[in-house]
A protein has these predicted regions:
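A short acidic, helix-capping loop that chelates divalent metal ions and anchors anionic groups
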Residues: 54-57, 165, 216-217
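Catalytic alpha/beta core domains of metabolic enzymes, predominantly
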Residues: 73-74, 87-196
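A general structural signal for well-ordered alpha-helical segments in protein cores
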Residues: 5, 9, 34, 68, ...
Length: 231
């Protein structure tokens, strides 16, 4: 429920206690709902909002521009666009990102499309931006390539399981120690694949259960990992 969603954000803010920034997922395929959740996330203490493209109703690029501009006008919090068309059926194109990047409250994008041409276009938008416009990967398999191509980081599924390693890879790339970063990254290619043997977040939650962090239970319509994958 929306109330539970906000309680998770509030709990996270309290646990973090200012040590690192909190990025709250507050997107919706309803602009009004996204504004409400983003406003509440800011009130609770989130530092950034992550706004997924509207799913199911699949607006065109004009609709996406108006959707995001309306949220950015109404909510005075740093906002990150989130593009994951494989899950939403909605793809925010680079030319649309370029328009949105000019709004002072829209400070970056989490891009889950694994495509070098797309990455290059977004990096170029970032370079041309008068303000810092940040490019984050939303795809563990290609995040190394995105950052070494000029991107800024990753919002990662695998980081739930190996947070230090993902952080180390990013730091090494920033320090231009690319070969060292690549050696670490190559060790986890199999893990990146395993995390998507079923729909995310089923595999990552099963691994966290096996690590002793959470219970082995999911809410419908998600179900536990198929036993044939447990080995």
């Amino acid at each position: 429920t929306v109330d539970e969603h906000l309680k998770v954000i509030e709990h996270t803010v309290k646990c973090v206690n200012g040590r690192i920034p909190v990025i709250a997922g507050s997107g919706s395929n309803s602009t009004a709902q996204a504004i409400e959740t983003t406003t509440e996330s800011q009130r609770i203490g989130a530092d950034f909002s992550l706004l997924v493209t509207p799913y199911y109703n699949r607006p065109n690029q004009k609709g996406l521009i108006e959707h995001y501009i309306k949220i950015a006008d109404e909510c005075n919090i740093n906002q990150i666009l989130y593009n994951v068309p494989s899950r939403t059926g909605c793809d925010i194109l680079p030319e649309t990102v370029e328009i949105l990047s000019k709004h002072q409250n829209i400070i970056g994008i989490k891009e889950a499309v694994n495509n070098q041409k797309r990455i290059n276009e977004l990096v170029e938008i970032s370079k041309q931006s008068q303000e810092d416009f940040l490019i984050f990967s939303g795809d563990d398999e290609s995040f190394f390539n995105l950052i070494t191509s000029g991107g800024h980081g990753v919002i990662s599924v695998a980081a739930n399981v190996i947070p230090k390693s993902i952080s180390d890879i990013c730091k090494l790339i920033i320090e231009e120690r690319i070969e060292e970063a690549n050696e670490i990254n190559k060790k986890y290619q199999n893990l990146y694949d395993l995390l998507f043997i079923e729909s995310n977040p089923i595999p990552v939650k099963w691994i966290l259960f096996k690590m002793g962090f959470i219970q082995n239970s999911l809410r419908l319509p998600l179900v536990n990992l198929d036993k044939k994958f447990e080995e």
